[in-house]
C-alpha cells in the first residue's frame, strides 16, 4: 500500500463516509483540515511524521491566531486520521498519542 498522504486521506475519506457514516458537514470539515495539514508537510510519506512535527504544526495554528475550538477540531481530525492509519496497520505507532 502506498504511503502517499493524499492517497491515504482519500482512503480515510471513504472510511468516514461509508463505514463510520459521518455527516457531510463533518466530512467536509475533516477534509479541509487534513488538506491544510498535508499542505504543511514537505513529505508524502506519513511514516516520517513525528509527534514533534505534529506539535510544531499545532503551535503554528496558535501563532496564526486561530480560535482554540478550531485548533481542537483540527487536532481531532488529525488524530482520527492517524488512528485510522494504526487500525489499518499503515503505521505502527500513533504520533498523536502524545499531543
Model-identified regions with their sequence ranges:
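N-terminal core-binding DNA-recognition domain of tyrosine recombinases/integrases
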Residues: 10-25, 31-99
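A detector for short, charged/polar N-terminal pre-domain segments
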Residues: 1-7
Amino acid at each position: 500500500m502506498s504511503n502517499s498522504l493524499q492517497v491515504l486521506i482519500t482512503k480515510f475519506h471513504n472510511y468516514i463516509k461509508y463505514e463510520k457514516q459521518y455527516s457531510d458537514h463533518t466530512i467536509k470539515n475533516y477534509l479541509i483540515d487534513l488538506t491544510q495539514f498535508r499542505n504543511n508537510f514537505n513529505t508524502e510519506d506519513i511514516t516520517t511524521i513525528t509527534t514533534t512535527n505534529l506539535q510544531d504544526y499545532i503551535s503554528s495554528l496558535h501563532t496564526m491566531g486561530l480560535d482554540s475550538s478550531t485548533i481542537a477540531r483540527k487536532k481531532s481530525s488529525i488524530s482520527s486520521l492517524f488512528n485510522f492509519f494504526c487500525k489499518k496497520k499503515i503505521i505502527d505507532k500513533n504520533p498523536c498519542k502524545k499531543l
